Design a protein with these regions (language model features):
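Extreme N-terminal leader/anchor segments
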Residues: 1-53
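Aromatic-lined, polymer-binding surfaces characteristic
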Residues: 55, 59-61, 65-195
Length: 195
């Protein structure tokens, strides 16, 4: 159904002729190696391209060690907004390379295990589940899922996992709105209404 429906239009995406900028390709390619784009943070610039911080530890993702060494709390906030995932989705759609889908699925699965939704776990991290972090994740996911939906690896089981996680995140946002009158609250409300 989700692969063949044509009556739903999202003005934020172009499935027919997706474009992939060199910057987006760089973000997507580095994510394959657990080097994640985090807005306003980069390890260095090499050959005119930003090189992002590596979260790889022995072939697995270490979400905490690097984040714990950064003096700026905004690094940790931005990390949990998953800003590299839209670029991976566009790269998949533009190239058909299943490595982007596989990387996204493994990374998102790993993240969900490391940071269980507060509805399911006591003592969940307020940085991960508060403020703009869940709102940006849900907003971006609604925009990038259509790019991945045609992957042969996007099984009904995985779709159910992602849709349930998205619904749970939306409910977590709704139950924990930021203070009245803030831009964060406005963003949260917009995401909940759209989701």
């Amino acid at each position: 159904y989700y692969r063949t429906r044509s009556n739903v239009m999202n003005p934020n995406i172009n499935l027919m002729n997706p474009t992939l900028s060199p910057t987006e390709r760089n973000v997507a390619d580095q994510a394959l190696e657990h080097r994640f784009y985090i807005r306003n943070f980069k390890e260095k610039v090499a050959n005119g391209q930003e090189v992002y911080y590596s979260f790889d530890k022995d072939g697995k993702i270490d979400w905490e060690t690097l984040a714990g060494t950064m003096a700026d709390q905004e690094f940790r906030n931005q990390l949990h907004r998953h800003q590299w995932m839209p670029a991976q989705a566009k790269a998949y759609r533009a190239t058909g390379n299943e490595a982007y889908f596989t990387s996204w699925k493994k990374t998102y699965t790993d993240w969900m295990k490391a940071y269980a939704n507060p509805k399911a776990a006591q003592g969940s991290d307020p940085v991960v589940w508060g403020g703009l972090q869940p709102a940006e994740r849900v907003r971006d996911r609604m925009n990038f899922l259509p790019y991945f939906i045609q992957s042969a690896q996007f099984t009904p089981g995985w779709l159910s996992t992602v849709l349930k996680a998205t619904a749970d995140e939306g409910e977590t946002i709704r139950q924990g709105y930021y203070r009245e009158g803030s831009n964060i609250r406005l963003t949260q409300a917009r995401v909940v209404a759209t989701a």
